[in-house]
Amino acid sequence: MPRDRRKFYIHTFGCQMNQADSGIIAALLEQDGYQQASSEEEAGIIMLNTCAVRENAVERIAHYLQHVKGFKRKCPELLVGLTGCIPQYRREELFTVFPVIDFLAGPDTYRVLPVLIAEAGKGRAARLDFNPFETYDGVTQARTQSLTAFVPIMRGCNNMCAFCVVPFTRGRERSHPFGSVLDEVRALAESGCREITLLGQNVNSYHDSQSGADFSRLLDAVSREAPETRIRFTTSHPKDMSHSLVETMASRPNICNHLHLPVQSGSTRMLARMNRGHDIEDYRNKIELLRERIPGISLSTDLIAGFCGESDADHCQTLELMREVRFDSAFMFYYSVRPGTLAARTMPDDVPEEVKKQRLQEIIDLQNGISAELLRLAIGSVVEVLVESESRRSSDQLMGRTGGNRVVVFDRGIHQPGDMVRVMITGSTSATLIGRAAENQH
Protein backbone atom coordinates (compact mmCIF):
# COMPACT_ATOMS: atom_id res chain seq x y z
CA MET A 1 0.00 0.00 0.00
CA PRO A 2 1.51 3.39 -1.01
CA ARG A 3 1.97 5.97 1.72
CA ASP A 4 0.12 9.27 1.49
CA ARG A 5 2.24 12.26 2.56
CA ARG A 6 -0.90 14.11 3.69
CA LYS A 7 -2.00 11.31 6.02
CA PHE A 8 -0.80 11.00 9.60
CA TYR A 9 -1.02 8.33 12.29
CA ILE A 10 -0.63 9.04 16.04
CA HIS A 11 0.40 6.38 18.54
CA THR A 12 -0.36 7.66 22.04
CA PHE A 13 1.58 6.65 25.15
CA GLY A 14 0.81 7.55 28.75
CA CYS A 15 -1.87 9.50 30.56
CA GLN A 16 -5.30 10.89 29.68
CA MET A 17 -3.73 14.30 29.05
CA ASN A 18 -1.67 12.76 26.26
CA GLN A 19 -4.82 11.22 24.81
CA ALA A 20 -6.44 14.65 24.80
CA ASP A 21 -3.30 16.18 23.29
CA SER A 22 -3.39 13.61 20.47
CA GLY A 23 -6.90 14.87 19.70
CA ILE A 24 -5.55 18.44 19.62
CA ILE A 25 -2.68 17.43 17.30
CA ALA A 26 -5.11 15.67 14.97
CA ALA A 27 -7.47 18.67 14.90
CA LEU A 28 -4.68 21.13 14.11
CA LEU A 29 -3.33 18.97 11.29
CA GLU A 30 -6.81 18.40 9.85
CA GLN A 31 -7.33 22.17 9.82
CA ASP A 32 -4.25 22.35 7.60
CA GLY A 33 -5.57 19.77 5.14
CA TYR A 34 -4.03 16.60 6.53
CA GLN A 35 -6.07 13.44 7.08
CA GLN A 36 -5.88 10.93 9.91
CA ALA A 37 -4.86 7.51 8.56
CA SER A 38 -6.75 4.41 9.65
CA SER A 39 -3.47 2.51 10.06
CA GLU A 40 0.23 3.27 10.35
CA GLU A 41 0.85 1.31 7.11
CA GLU A 42 -0.88 3.96 4.95
CA ALA A 43 0.42 7.07 6.75
CA GLY A 44 3.14 9.29 5.36
CA ILE A 45 3.69 10.73 8.85
CA ILE A 46 3.88 8.64 12.02
CA MET A 47 3.93 10.45 15.36
CA LEU A 48 4.56 9.01 18.80
CA ASN A 49 2.92 11.17 21.47
CA THR A 50 5.06 10.33 24.47
CA CYS A 51 5.11 10.29 28.27
CA ALA A 52 8.23 10.81 30.43
CA VAL A 53 6.88 10.13 33.92
CA ARG A 54 8.46 6.67 34.33
CA GLU A 55 12.01 5.55 33.59
CA ASN A 56 10.84 2.81 31.25
CA ALA A 57 9.03 5.33 29.02
CA VAL A 58 12.07 5.80 26.77
CA GLU A 59 12.50 2.01 26.59
CA ARG A 60 8.92 1.66 25.35
CA ILE A 61 9.53 4.35 22.74
CA ALA A 62 12.77 2.65 21.66
CA HIS A 63 10.94 -0.64 21.20
CA TYR A 64 8.24 0.99 19.09
CA LEU A 65 10.79 2.90 17.00
CA GLN A 66 12.44 -0.42 16.09
CA HIS A 67 9.07 -1.38 14.63
CA VAL A 68 8.82 1.94 12.75
CA LYS A 69 12.37 1.57 11.43
CA GLY A 70 11.14 -1.27 9.22
CA PHE A 71 8.60 1.05 7.62
CA LYS A 72 11.28 3.67 7.06
CA ARG A 73 13.57 1.19 5.29
CA LYS A 74 10.81 0.40 2.81
CA CYS A 75 9.79 4.05 2.42
CA PRO A 76 12.61 6.54 3.16
CA GLU A 77 10.18 9.45 2.58
CA LEU A 78 8.17 8.44 5.66
CA LEU A 79 8.40 11.13 8.36
CA VAL A 80 8.68 10.01 11.99
CA GLY A 81 8.03 12.47 14.80
CA LEU A 82 8.13 12.43 18.59
CA THR A 83 5.70 14.74 20.37
CA GLY A 84 4.86 15.26 24.03
CA CYS A 85 6.95 15.01 27.15
CA ILE A 86 9.97 12.94 26.09
CA PRO A 87 11.09 15.45 23.43
CA GLN A 88 10.67 18.28 25.95
CA TYR A 89 12.65 16.30 28.54
CA ARG A 90 15.40 14.71 26.42
CA ARG A 91 15.45 17.33 23.65
CA GLU A 92 17.76 17.17 20.61
CA GLU A 93 19.85 14.28 21.98
CA LEU A 94 16.99 12.09 20.73
CA PHE A 95 18.13 12.66 17.14
CA THR A 96 21.43 10.97 18.03
CA VAL A 97 19.94 8.18 20.12
CA PHE A 98 17.19 7.43 17.58
CA PRO A 99 18.34 8.35 14.03
CA VAL A 100 14.97 7.26 12.61
CA ILE A 101 13.34 10.41 14.08
CA ASP A 102 12.75 13.36 11.72
CA PHE A 103 11.09 15.92 14.01
CA LEU A 104 10.44 16.73 17.66
CA ALA A 105 7.58 18.79 19.11
CA GLY A 106 7.05 19.74 22.76
CA PRO A 107 3.59 20.00 24.36
CA ASP A 108 3.34 23.78 23.81
CA THR A 109 4.25 23.77 20.10
CA TYR A 110 1.50 21.79 18.38
CA ARG A 111 0.09 24.84 16.58
CA VAL A 112 3.25 24.97 14.43
CA LEU A 113 3.25 21.25 13.56
CA PRO A 114 2.35 21.89 9.89
CA VAL A 115 5.42 24.15 9.58
CA LEU A 116 7.55 21.65 11.48
CA ILE A 117 6.48 18.79 9.21
CA ALA A 118 7.31 20.85 6.13
CA GLU A 119 10.77 21.59 7.56
CA ALA A 120 11.28 17.92 8.41
CA GLY A 121 10.78 17.04 4.76
CA LYS A 122 14.06 18.86 4.08
CA GLY A 123 15.97 17.83 7.23
CA ARG A 124 15.56 17.29 10.93
CA ALA A 125 13.46 19.87 12.77
CA ALA A 126 12.49 20.60 16.37
CA ARG A 127 10.23 22.98 18.30
CA LEU A 128 10.71 22.63 22.05
CA ASP A 129 9.88 26.07 23.45
CA PHE A 130 7.69 26.56 26.51
CA ASN A 131 4.74 28.89 26.03
CA PRO A 132 3.38 30.08 29.40
CA PHE A 133 0.11 31.18 27.76
CA GLU A 134 -0.71 28.20 25.53
CA THR A 135 -3.88 26.34 26.50
CA TYR A 136 -5.03 25.46 22.95
CA ASP A 137 -8.13 27.50 23.60
CA GLY A 138 -10.35 27.43 20.52
CA VAL A 139 -9.07 24.04 19.30
CA THR A 140 -11.74 21.34 19.32
CA GLN A 141 -10.19 17.91 19.71
CA ALA A 142 -10.62 15.39 16.91
CA ARG A 143 -12.33 12.53 18.74
CA THR A 144 -12.62 8.95 17.53
CA GLN A 145 -15.61 8.04 19.70
CA SER A 146 -18.45 9.99 21.23
CA LEU A 147 -19.53 8.18 24.43
CA THR A 148 -16.78 9.53 26.68
CA ALA A 149 -14.48 12.53 26.37
CA PHE A 150 -11.50 14.16 28.05
CA VAL A 151 -11.65 17.93 28.52
CA PRO A 152 -8.38 19.57 29.63
CA ILE A 153 -9.04 22.49 31.99
CA MET A 154 -5.42 23.41 32.67
CA ARG A 155 -1.89 22.61 31.56
CA GLY A 156 1.42 22.42 33.40
CA CYS A 157 2.18 22.12 37.11
CA ASN A 158 3.60 24.44 39.78
CA ASN A 159 4.17 21.69 42.34
CA MET A 160 7.82 20.74 42.44
CA CYS A 161 7.47 17.22 43.84
CA ALA A 162 11.00 15.91 44.25
CA PHE A 163 10.49 12.81 42.09
CA CYS A 164 8.47 14.32 39.23
CA VAL A 165 9.45 15.56 35.76
CA VAL A 166 6.09 17.12 34.84
CA PRO A 167 7.06 20.76 35.65
CA PHE A 168 10.09 20.28 33.39
CA THR A 169 8.11 18.77 30.51
CA ARG A 170 4.82 20.70 30.63
CA GLY A 171 5.88 23.99 32.20
CA ARG A 172 4.04 26.22 34.66
CA GLU A 173 0.33 26.03 35.40
CA ARG A 174 -2.14 27.92 33.24
CA SER A 175 -5.90 27.43 33.29
CA HIS A 176 -8.31 27.28 30.37
CA PRO A 177 -10.86 30.10 30.33
CA PHE A 178 -13.97 29.28 32.37
CA GLY A 179 -16.34 30.03 29.50
CA SER A 180 -14.35 27.95 27.01
CA VAL A 181 -14.54 24.90 29.26
CA LEU A 182 -18.32 25.30 29.59
CA ASP A 183 -18.68 25.75 25.82
CA GLU A 184 -16.80 22.50 25.17
CA VAL A 185 -18.79 20.61 27.79
CA ARG A 186 -22.08 21.92 26.38
CA ALA A 187 -21.14 20.88 22.85
CA LEU A 188 -20.14 17.40 24.00
CA ALA A 189 -23.36 16.93 25.94
CA GLU A 190 -25.45 18.09 22.98
CA SER A 191 -23.60 15.60 20.73
CA GLY A 192 -24.62 12.70 23.01
CA CYS A 193 -21.48 12.30 25.12
CA ARG A 194 -22.37 10.30 28.24
CA GLU A 195 -19.27 10.91 30.38
CA ILE A 196 -16.81 13.81 30.54
CA THR A 197 -13.53 13.77 32.46
CA LEU A 198 -11.96 17.14 33.34
CA LEU A 199 -8.18 16.92 33.10
CA GLY A 200 -5.21 18.67 34.65
CA GLN A 201 -1.92 17.80 36.30
CA ASN A 202 -3.57 19.24 39.44
CA VAL A 203 -7.17 20.21 38.77
CA ASN A 204 -7.55 21.47 42.34
CA SER A 205 -5.36 24.48 41.57
CA TYR A 206 -7.55 25.62 38.66
CA HIS A 207 -8.02 29.40 38.64
CA ASP A 208 -9.73 31.47 35.97
CA SER A 209 -7.98 34.84 35.87
CA GLN A 210 -11.01 36.76 34.53
CA SER A 211 -13.82 35.46 36.77
CA GLY A 212 -11.70 34.34 39.73
CA ALA A 213 -13.43 30.94 39.62
CA ASP A 214 -11.69 28.08 41.41
CA PHE A 215 -12.11 24.39 40.64
CA SER A 216 -15.12 23.79 42.88
CA ARG A 217 -16.99 26.58 41.10
CA LEU A 218 -15.98 25.25 37.68
CA LEU A 219 -16.99 21.70 38.61
CA ASP A 220 -20.39 22.88 39.83
CA ALA A 221 -20.95 24.85 36.62
CA VAL A 222 -19.87 21.93 34.43
CA SER A 223 -22.22 19.54 36.22
CA ARG A 224 -25.13 21.97 35.71
CA GLU A 225 -24.21 22.59 32.07
CA ALA A 226 -24.46 18.84 31.34
CA PRO A 227 -26.89 17.48 33.96
CA GLU A 228 -27.50 14.18 32.11
CA THR A 229 -23.78 13.51 31.63
CA ARG A 230 -21.48 11.84 34.13
CA ILE A 231 -18.67 14.13 35.27
CA ARG A 232 -15.27 12.91 36.46
CA PHE A 233 -11.99 14.72 37.07
CA THR A 234 -8.33 13.88 37.54
CA THR A 235 -5.75 14.41 38.99
CA SER A 236 -6.13 16.00 42.44
CA HIS A 237 -3.34 17.03 44.81
CA PRO A 238 -4.18 16.41 48.50
CA LYS A 239 -2.80 19.76 49.65
CA ASP A 240 -5.28 21.63 47.43
CA MET A 241 -8.33 19.46 48.19
CA SER A 242 -10.77 22.04 49.58
CA HIS A 243 -13.92 21.65 51.68
CA SER A 244 -15.86 23.52 49.00
CA LEU A 245 -14.82 20.94 46.41
CA VAL A 246 -16.00 18.09 48.63
CA GLU A 247 -19.34 19.88 49.10
CA THR A 248 -19.71 20.32 45.34
CA MET A 249 -19.06 16.61 44.81
CA ALA A 250 -21.59 15.72 47.50
CA SER A 251 -24.32 18.03 46.20
CA ARG A 252 -24.30 17.34 42.46
CA PRO A 253 -25.81 13.96 41.47
CA ASN A 254 -24.00 13.62 38.14
CA ILE A 255 -20.51 14.03 39.62
CA CYS A 256 -19.11 10.51 39.96
CA ASN A 257 -18.49 9.19 43.47
CA HIS A 258 -14.86 8.42 42.70
CA LEU A 259 -11.71 10.35 43.51
CA HIS A 260 -8.11 9.69 42.55
CA LEU A 261 -6.05 11.27 45.35
CA PRO A 262 -2.35 10.38 45.10
CA VAL A 263 -0.63 9.99 48.48
CA GLN A 264 2.71 8.45 47.32
CA SER A 265 3.72 7.41 50.87
CA GLY A 266 2.12 6.81 54.26
CA SER A 267 5.06 8.45 56.05
CA THR A 268 5.05 12.16 56.90
CA ARG A 269 8.85 12.09 56.84
CA MET A 270 8.83 10.77 53.28
CA LEU A 271 6.15 13.24 52.19
CA ALA A 272 8.42 16.05 53.38
CA ARG A 273 11.37 14.60 51.43
CA MET A 274 9.12 14.30 48.39
CA ASN A 275 8.13 17.99 48.80
CA ARG A 276 4.43 17.10 48.76
CA GLY A 277 3.32 20.06 50.88
CA HIS A 278 1.16 18.15 53.38
CA ASP A 279 1.54 15.55 56.12
CA ILE A 280 -0.18 12.21 56.51
CA GLU A 281 -2.64 13.46 59.14
CA ASP A 282 -3.86 16.09 56.69
CA TYR A 283 -4.42 13.32 54.15
CA ARG A 284 -6.28 11.18 56.69
CA ASN A 285 -8.50 14.12 57.64
CA LYS A 286 -9.44 14.70 54.01
CA ILE A 287 -10.26 11.02 53.52
CA GLU A 288 -12.45 11.17 56.62
CA LEU A 289 -14.27 14.26 55.30
CA LEU A 290 -14.80 12.64 51.89
CA ARG A 291 -16.29 9.50 53.41
CA GLU A 292 -18.47 11.51 55.77
CA ARG A 293 -19.92 13.74 53.03
CA ILE A 294 -19.97 11.18 50.17
CA PRO A 295 -20.86 7.77 51.62
CA GLY A 296 -19.66 4.93 49.41
CA ILE A 297 -17.09 7.04 47.57
CA SER A 298 -14.49 5.00 45.69
CA LEU A 299 -10.89 6.08 46.29
CA SER A 300 -7.77 5.36 44.27
CA THR A 301 -4.21 6.58 44.73
CA ASP A 302 -0.56 6.49 43.60
CA LEU A 303 2.16 4.84 45.70
CA ILE A 304 5.95 4.95 45.33
CA ALA A 305 8.14 2.32 47.00
CA GLY A 306 11.77 2.96 47.84
CA PHE A 307 12.05 6.72 47.47
CA CYS A 308 15.35 8.26 48.59
CA GLY A 309 16.01 7.57 52.27
CA GLU A 310 12.92 5.41 52.81
CA SER A 311 13.36 3.18 55.88
CA ASP A 312 11.58 -0.03 56.83
CA ALA A 313 9.52 2.05 59.26
CA ASP A 314 8.47 4.47 56.49
CA HIS A 315 7.43 1.53 54.32
CA CYS A 316 5.42 0.00 57.16
CA GLN A 317 3.57 3.30 57.58
CA THR A 318 2.54 3.10 53.92
CA LEU A 319 1.17 -0.41 54.46
CA GLU A 320 -0.62 0.81 57.59
CA LEU A 321 -2.26 3.66 55.67
CA MET A 322 -3.39 1.25 52.95
CA ARG A 323 -5.03 -1.04 55.51
CA GLU A 324 -6.72 1.95 57.12
CA VAL A 325 -8.00 3.73 53.99
CA ARG A 326 -8.67 0.58 51.91
CA PHE A 327 -8.22 2.13 48.49
CA ASP A 328 -10.30 0.57 45.73
CA SER A 329 -7.26 0.61 43.46
CA ALA A 330 -3.78 2.08 43.15
CA PHE A 331 -1.04 2.82 40.65
CA MET A 332 2.06 1.35 42.29
CA PHE A 333 5.70 1.80 41.28
CA TYR A 334 9.15 1.69 42.76
CA TYR A 335 11.20 4.87 42.61
CA SER A 336 13.43 5.51 39.61
CA VAL A 337 15.69 8.55 39.28
CA ARG A 338 14.45 11.15 36.79
CA PRO A 339 17.38 13.38 35.78
CA GLY A 340 16.85 17.08 36.49
CA THR A 341 14.35 16.59 39.32
CA LEU A 342 14.93 17.87 42.85
CA ALA A 343 15.58 14.33 44.09
CA ALA A 344 18.10 13.63 41.34
CA ARG A 345 19.96 16.86 42.12
CA THR A 346 19.97 16.71 45.93
CA MET A 347 19.30 13.18 47.23
CA PRO A 348 21.16 9.90 46.88
CA ASP A 349 19.16 7.03 45.39
CA ASP A 350 20.14 4.94 48.40
CA VAL A 351 17.48 2.22 48.63
CA PRO A 352 18.86 -0.92 46.92
CA GLU A 353 16.86 -2.05 43.91
CA GLU A 354 16.11 -5.46 45.41
CA VAL A 355 14.65 -3.71 48.49
CA LYS A 356 12.56 -1.41 46.27
CA LYS A 357 11.19 -4.42 44.41
CA GLN A 358 10.45 -6.30 47.62
CA ARG A 359 8.60 -3.33 49.12
CA LEU A 360 6.69 -2.77 45.90
CA GLN A 361 5.61 -6.40 45.85
CA GLU A 362 4.33 -6.11 49.42
CA ILE A 363 2.34 -3.02 48.42
CA ILE A 364 0.93 -4.78 45.34
CA ASP A 365 -0.01 -7.92 47.27
CA LEU A 366 -1.77 -5.90 49.97
CA GLN A 367 -3.64 -3.72 47.46
CA ASN A 368 -4.70 -6.70 45.35
CA GLY A 369 -6.16 -8.32 48.44
CA ILE A 370 -8.03 -5.17 49.46
CA SER A 371 -9.34 -4.58 45.93
CA ALA A 372 -10.59 -8.16 45.61
CA GLU A 373 -12.30 -8.00 49.00
CA LEU A 374 -14.06 -4.72 48.17
CA LEU A 375 -15.32 -6.24 44.93
CA ARG A 376 -16.63 -9.31 46.76
CA LEU A 377 -18.51 -7.04 49.16
CA ALA A 378 -20.38 -5.57 46.17
CA ILE A 379 -21.99 -8.94 45.35
CA GLY A 380 -25.73 -8.71 45.85
CA SER A 381 -25.91 -4.96 45.24
CA VAL A 382 -27.46 -3.18 42.26
CA VAL A 383 -25.21 -0.64 40.54
CA GLU A 384 -25.70 1.82 37.71
CA VAL A 385 -23.36 1.09 34.82
CA LEU A 386 -22.52 3.23 31.80
CA VAL A 387 -21.95 0.71 28.99
CA GLU A 388 -18.73 1.53 27.14
CA SER A 389 -18.22 -1.39 24.75
CA GLU A 390 -18.57 -5.07 24.11
CA SER A 391 -16.58 -7.26 26.47
CA ARG A 392 -13.17 -8.19 25.10
CA ARG A 393 -13.96 -11.86 25.66
CA SER A 394 -17.40 -12.09 24.07
CA SER A 395 -19.70 -10.01 21.90
CA ASP A 396 -22.57 -11.48 23.93
CA GLN A 397 -21.39 -9.48 26.94
CA LEU A 398 -21.02 -5.76 27.57
CA MET A 399 -18.45 -3.86 29.63
CA GLY A 400 -19.02 -0.64 31.50
CA ARG A 401 -18.14 1.29 34.65
CA THR A 402 -19.95 2.36 37.75
CA GLY A 403 -19.81 5.91 39.03
CA GLY A 404 -17.16 4.60 41.42
CA ASN A 405 -15.04 3.56 38.40
CA ARG A 406 -15.47 -0.17 38.93
CA VAL A 407 -15.47 -2.31 35.78
CA VAL A 408 -18.64 -4.39 35.33
CA VAL A 409 -19.28 -7.15 32.76
CA PHE A 410 -22.79 -8.47 32.15
CA ASP A 411 -24.83 -10.32 29.51
CA ARG A 412 -25.78 -8.07 26.63
CA GLY A 413 -29.49 -8.71 26.32
CA ILE A 414 -31.16 -5.71 24.67
CA HIS A 415 -28.56 -3.17 25.79
CA GLN A 416 -25.97 -1.27 23.73
CA PRO A 417 -22.88 0.88 24.34
CA GLY A 418 -24.03 4.25 25.64
CA ASP A 419 -26.88 2.84 27.69
CA MET A 420 -27.09 3.44 31.42
CA VAL A 421 -28.03 0.07 32.91
CA ARG A 422 -28.89 -1.04 36.42
CA VAL A 423 -26.92 -4.25 37.01
CA MET A 424 -27.34 -6.82 39.78
CA ILE A 425 -23.84 -7.93 40.86
CA THR A 426 -23.63 -11.72 41.08
CA GLY A 427 -19.88 -12.33 41.24
CA SER A 428 -16.41 -10.86 40.97
CA THR A 429 -12.89 -11.58 39.75
CA SER A 430 -9.71 -9.93 41.01
CA ALA A 431 -10.49 -6.71 39.13
CA THR A 432 -13.99 -6.97 37.67
CA LEU A 433 -17.59 -7.21 38.83
CA ILE A 434 -19.84 -9.74 37.09
CA GLY A 435 -23.59 -9.27 36.90
CA ARG A 436 -26.86 -9.33 35.01
CA ALA A 437 -29.22 -6.55 34.05
CA ALA A 438 -31.62 -5.89 36.91
CA GLU A 439 -35.29 -6.60 36.23
CA ASN A 440 -36.24 -3.12 37.40
CA GLN A 441 -34.45 -0.55 35.22
CA HIS A 442 -36.07 2.49 36.85
UniProtKB/Swiss-Prot annotation:
The keyword tRNA processing applies. GO terms for molecular function: 4 iron, 4 sulfur cluster binding; metal ion binding; N6-isopentenyladenosine methylthiotransferase activity. Residues 143-373 form the Radical SAM core domain. It is found in: Cytoplasm. [4Fe-4S] cluster 2 binds at C157, C161, C164. [4Fe-4S] cluster 1 binds at C15, C51, C85. Catalyzes the methylthiolation of N6-(dimethylallyl)adenosine (i(6)A), leading to the formation of 2-methylthio-N6-(dimethylallyl)adenosine (ms(2)i(6)A) at position 37 in tRNAs that read codons beginning with uridine. This is tRNA-2-methylthio-N(6)-dimethylallyladenosine synthase. It comes from Chlorobium limicola (strain DSM 245 / NBRC 103803 / 6330). The lineage of its organism: Bacteria, Pseudomonadati, Chlorobiota, Chlorobiia, Chlorobiales.
